[in-house]
Curated annotation (Swiss-Prot):
<dbReference type="Pfam" id="PF03133">
    <property type="entry name" value="TTL"/>
</dbReference>
<feature type="binding site">
    <location>
        <position position="328"/>
    </location>
    <ligand>
        <name>Mg(2+) 2</name>
    </ligand>
</feature>
<dbReference type="GO" id="GO:0005874">
    <property type="term" value="C:microtubule"/>
</dbReference>
<keyword id="KW-0067">ATP-binding</keyword>
<feature type="binding site">
    <location>
        <position position="220"/>
    </location>
    <ligand>
        <name>L-glutamate</name>
    </ligand>
</feature>
<dbReference type="InterPro" id="IPR004344">
    <property type="entry name" value="TTL/TTLL_fam"/>
</dbReference>
<feature type="binding site">
    <location>
        <begin position="144"/>
        <end position="145"/>
    </location>
    <ligand>
        <name>ATP</name>
    </ligand>
</feature>
<keyword id="KW-0206">Cytoskeleton</keyword>
<comment type="subunit">
    <text>Part of the neuronal tubulin polyglutamylase complex which contains TPGS1, TPGS2, TTLL1, LRRC49 and NICN1. Interacts with PCM1, CSTPP1 and LRRC49.</text>
</comment>
<feature type="region of interest" description="Disordered">
    <location>
        <begin position="391"/>
        <end position="423"/>
    </location>
</feature>
<dbReference type="GO" id="GO:0005737">
    <property type="term" value="C:cytoplasm"/>
</dbReference>
<feature type="domain" description="TTL">
    <location>
        <begin position="1"/>
        <end position="367"/>
    </location>
</feature>
<feature type="binding site">
    <location>
        <position position="313"/>
    </location>
    <ligand>
        <name>Mg(2+) 1</name>
    </ligand>
</feature>
<keyword id="KW-0460">Magnesium</keyword>
<dbReference type="GO" id="GO:0036064">
    <property type="term" value="C:ciliary basal body"/>
</dbReference>
<dbReference type="GO" id="GO:0007288">
    <property type="term" value="P:sperm axoneme assembly"/>
</dbReference>
<keyword id="KW-0547">Nucleotide-binding</keyword>
């Protein structure tokens, strides 16, 4: 389509604006005709609100799905994954198989989690089974480590309840909802420090599901060496990897920002644990991401004007088992280091190359499966249409940690690489 793209954003970040200007796009206000709006989650709520009566035209696209929170709100993500497991179980899917103790063999990738106040009685029952465990409490709708704390006694929850002016956990209240999850107290450590992975995943459509993994993810390290000691439960520099918290620590390094690239992690693990187990670990991480997206796909409003770049947070335990901690709808575009700035600029550049082909005025009927040469540092993680064409046999061969058979873990079809083609 002829003409220049008219853009708007309510997120004033240089990595965004520089990418728009590089393309020769024209900045306008939200009250003018626009084609591309990179917006906050608060704004997307208003845009798709029934009350506003706003309707997007065919030449407008935005960077969030209307109900992205089905994946990015901590309580709803867990709820959808639990529902997904039960549906697979009901269908008799081999993916829902359990071991003798009742644990899922292939879908056990989220720590045991309860919603508070709704699931308080269920939580107490579980807590009493293993009273020496540590649990982590998080507000459902906050980010950057805000409002998070660890507990190892029921009395701590009761105190929190009183402090929050909540009379009872048994009934629903107007107070802020929390999730409480079993704390992964045996994290893989490097240099004695806990870390997590921040991985970027772009979804162009949920039905059919098509998603892309960004190759340049990174690890975020704590500044203080890890200890499971109860005396350090309140020390968030030991337990939380969020840069928003760690940058206030005495030992925070402003040059590298306490970060490693995922490629460096891979090389480290290959040299210390071996290539085979490292490959298996990354296969399982890809598996987790695809299954989490499949879990929310049926309830996601797959609006044709939308795409979304998510920030996945994964923790690896000392047995090299990956755990999905949460998914962020607005991964930080703030640059804490020079390398960070380059990474995030390239992330936005590659995202725009897929979402707005050739930098031209968008068409909501855009080709959501672009050719490989425009992907940049993205790789196709899962393409439902290709996977369906591969038959049910792949479902049985592609469970995490198992060989994918003679085809391997990569399927090349029509010039596109599919990293994981799990059914």
């Amino acid at each position: 389509m002829a003409g220049k793209v008219k853009w708007v954003t309510d997120i004033e970040k240089s990595v965004l604006i520089n990418n728009f200007e590089k393309r020769g796009w024209v900045q306008v206000t939200e009250n003018e005709d626009w084609n591309f709006y990179w917006m906050s989650v608060q704004t997307i709520r208003n845009v798709f609100s029934v009350e506003t009566g706003y309707r997007l035209s065919d030449d407008q696209i935005v960077n969030h799905f209307p109900n992205h929170y089905e994946l990015t709100r901590k309580d709803l993500m867990v709820k959808n994954i639990k529902r997904y497991r039960k549906e697979l179980e009901k269908e008799g899917s081999p993916l829902a198989e359990k071991d003798e103790s009742g644990k899922y063999l292939y879908l056990d990738f989220v720590p045991v989690t309860y919603m508070l106040p709704a699931d308080y009685n269920l939580f107490v029952e579980e807590f009493r089974k293993s009273p020496s465990s540590t649990w982590i409490m998080k507000p459902c709708g906050k980010a950057q480590g805000k409002g998070i704390f660890l507990i190892n006694k029921l009395s701590q929850i009761k105190k929190w309840s009183r402090d929050s002016k909540t009379s009872s956990f048994v009934t629903q209240s107007t107070k802020e909802a929390y999730v409480i999850s079993l704390y992964i107290n045996n994290p893989l450590l490097i240099g004695g420090r806990k870390f997590d992975l921040r991985l970027y995943v772009l979804v162009s459509t949920y039905r059919p599901l098509r998603c892309y993994m960004y190759k340049l993810g990174f690890c975020r390290f704590c500044t203080v060496k890890y200890t499971p000691s109860t005396s350090e439960l309140d020390n968030m520099f030991v337990h939380l990897t969020n840069v928003a918290i760690q940058k206030h620590g005495e030992d925070y390094n402003h040059i590298h920002g306490g970060k490693w690239t995922v490629n460096n992690l891979r090389l480290y693990l290959e040299s210390t644990r071996g290539k085979e187990v490292t490959s298996k670990l990354f296969d399982e991480i890809h598996w987790i991401i695809v299954q989490s997206l499949k879990a929310v796909a049926p309830v996601m409003n797959n609006d044709k004007h939308c795409f979304e770049c998510y920030g996945y947070d994964i923790i690896i335990d000392d047995k090299l088992k990956p755990w999905l901690i949460e998914v962020n709808a607005s991964p930080s575009l703030t640059s804490s280091t020079a390398n960070d700035r380059i990474l995030k600029y390239n992330l936005i550049n590659d995202t725009l190359n897929i979402a707005v082909p050739n930098g031209e005025i968008p068409d909501c009927k855009w080709n959501k499966s672009p050719p490989k040469e425009v992907l940049g540092n993205y790789e196709i993680l899962y393409d439902e249409e290709l996977a369906q064409g591969d038959g049910a046999e792949r479902e049985l061969r592609s469970r995490p940690g198992q060989s994918l058979g003679p085809k391997g873990s990569r399927l090349r079809d029509a010039g596109r690489t599919v990293l994981t083609t799990w059914k």
